[in-house]
């Protein structure tokens, strides 16, 4: 709050720096130009606009950051002072003519009020010397005190001083024959220029109705003229030697004996009847002075009345012009239809459309001209707010990027259609397609020469898209059933956007083809066949990618695109190339075409997968063989990961293919996990046996020191343990090799189905960075390696997870053990503490005695808390 207040003070009362030089503050100046003063965030009827150009704005910043004690004319406090003076001017506008005509000498309370008002204007004279002014040549605020003083002194200072000096200061010096009081009162009318400026600002202020501002201004001008006419004419009568030869005597012979109020009302009556030219009760001049004044008064009235009538006529015509134009348009359309003998239904459509357009414009529903005049960013924001949700649910745009969807919404035009109006005609050129926002339309086909309704489109449906995307005449006539709001998208604008988003264009085309396939209409089936033929021949206007052709298995289209110079290694938004897709789909001809045109057989996608692995996991042996013959390999840094994936899917054939194509399945991934580790975790004896036959090492530890043999013992896989023993009969204990960390207890943490965690980003293959959800393994997250992989995540995060068991994402359970005082007792489940001393204290609280020994279920003594695992049974004994 303090900062904001200080910013405002910088704008209005800026600080002065060394030598009187103002510090340059371009950012602050620009901010204050747009937000401070009396300028709101959305109104620029008041305030100072910056000049064009960045350099010009910088050069003018010193004029925006005003000097010390110089007030901006746009300061809201100064504007409030100005409004206060306008109210005082309204009083002056009445009092000055009244004192001139009806008073000869000062009389309370008017004289007191006059002096109070004069005091305020005297303060304003002093204040004006400290108010910056706008240079009309450069439109910059001038804050030099000398220039401000010179400008004011050489222009309006003398008038302001004369109109402010009280009459009492020098009235006694004037001769008795001079009506000094009234003359000096009239000098105060100089202040009326403030009212004119006030109304000029109000007319530009959108918060106030322009019609009523103009009417108020004209009314005040009329009242002021009538008031002045009455006062001037009465002054002539009051100073005429013979009171009986004046216009006042026509109504009352002894009019000078009447009260001041009666005389003022009488004079106002004659003045206003003369001003309004009613023809009865006009001021009748009985002497030469009155006749001369009335002559000029009535001539002036003629001009003023012409001005008032012209203004009022213009205001009324402006209000009714829209209705008049509507009626003229309806009349012209009806005359045209009748003159050319148009069908009655077509005439009704014309009139209904024009009537609806008038309603939408008059009710503010569709101000297209105003919207088109706005900047593109504002237009886009309006369209996004109103229509994004509807367009997002349209089948044609399912799966496209948010960027393209936003751009499409920005290009759409909202239109209203009355009931029974044709939106699209059969066989017309496909220039636009439409999305339903509200309402409903009938889709009409011509069957045996008769129009029949074959379908209906409602909110969120699209029509006309087949003609636009396939570039063929529209198939159906679309006619509204009731008042409907539609979004129209021009074909040219649509194609221009899709050209810059080739991948999204393929998605849109797939959505259309799937829609045609799902349709039961025979006509749509025929269109599907024609469209697919056009795709194969490359005759579609939509930009199609190699990935689109590969996904469809369309080798003809793929060949056409490659002949046109498409990059065989181009990728989609997931980093997958056409070769990845063709290999996974089993499209052998597509694979051949891509390899012939130079596609890289070892290119990786964003997940690190290569085409050969896609062919292997998809069981496309011919593609795998073809890729291998053309140089495709499973690289050393990823083969261990692929092997683990195959084991996780219990896919023995994939492991065999890895071996077949030169992969070493005994290698480990970045966590040191081998395929044998994974096979033991899955409990798959067949795969374990196969891996052992291919040279897998059962005693090779991972980064935690766990070997496959130790895992089999821990998980209780008796058949696997027997296989290991028969393969290599050694003592069943975990072997720590040099350089490996000490074995950590098992910890259960949430994990992705694949082991993607790593020590360093450089050491990790791309495939381990992001694993596709389509390859999730159902069993791994509950396996030992799933637990350990998640534990690795915890260690890398810097927090100790030795006793942590995660649940889902972010939830951590502590490791738990069962303690008992007797071997046969069921015991109590407690949280595993960090030391044996704490465990003994817990035993004292739970069991009621202080234990001196801690034994395992098998009777072995435990002397280190680190060898206790989650779920162990502990026997606490007190030995004397």
Curated annotation (Swiss-Prot):
PROSITE patterns per the UniProt record, alphabetical: ANK_REP_REGION, ANK_REPEAT, CNMP_BINDING_3, KHA
Transmembrane stretches, start-end: 83-103, 112-132, 154-174, 183-203, 218-238, 292-312
Cytoplasmic domain ranges by topology: 1-82, 133-153, 204-217, 313-880
Residues exposed to the Extracellular side: 104-111, 175-182, 239-265, 286-291
Cellular component terms (Gene Ontology): monoatomic ion channel complex
Keyword vocabulary terms for this entry: ANK repeat, Ion channel, Ion transport, Membrane, Potassium, Potassium channel, Potassium transport, Repeat, Transmembrane, Transmembrane helix, Transport, Voltage-gated channel
Membrane topology: Multi-pass membrane protein
ANK repeats: 541-570, 574-603, 607-636, 637-667, 671-700
Intramembrane region ranges (chain numbering): 266-285
Annotated tissue distribution: Predominantly expressed in flowers.
Residues engaged in binding a nucleoside 3',5'-cyclic phosphate: 396-517
InterPro entries the record matches: Ankyrin_rpt, Ankyrin_rpt-contain_sf, cNMP-bd_dom, cNMP-bd_dom_sf, Ion_trans_dom, K_chnl_volt-dep_EAG/ELK/ERG, KAT/AKT, KHA_dom
SUPFAM superfamilies: Ankyrin repeat, cAMP-binding domain-like, Voltage-gated potassium channels
GO molecular function, one term: voltage-gated potassium channel activity
Keyword Repeat among UniProt keywords: yes
Compartments where located: Membrane
Domain KHA: 809-880
Record note on quaternary structure: The potassium channel is probably composed of a homo- or heterotetrameric complex of pore-forming subunits.
Family statement drawn from the similarity comment of this UniProt entry: Belongs to the potassium channel family. Plant (TC 1.A.1.4) subfamily.
Function: Probable potassium channel. May interact with the cytoskeleton or with regulatory proteins.
The record's note on its domains: The segment S4 is probably the voltage-sensor and is characterized by a series of positively charged amino acids. The pore-forming region H5 is enclosed by the transmembrane segments S5 and S6 in the Shaker-type (1P/6TM) and contains the GYGD signature motif which seems to be involved in potassium selectivity.
Protein name: Probable potassium channel AKT5
Gene name as annotated: AKT5
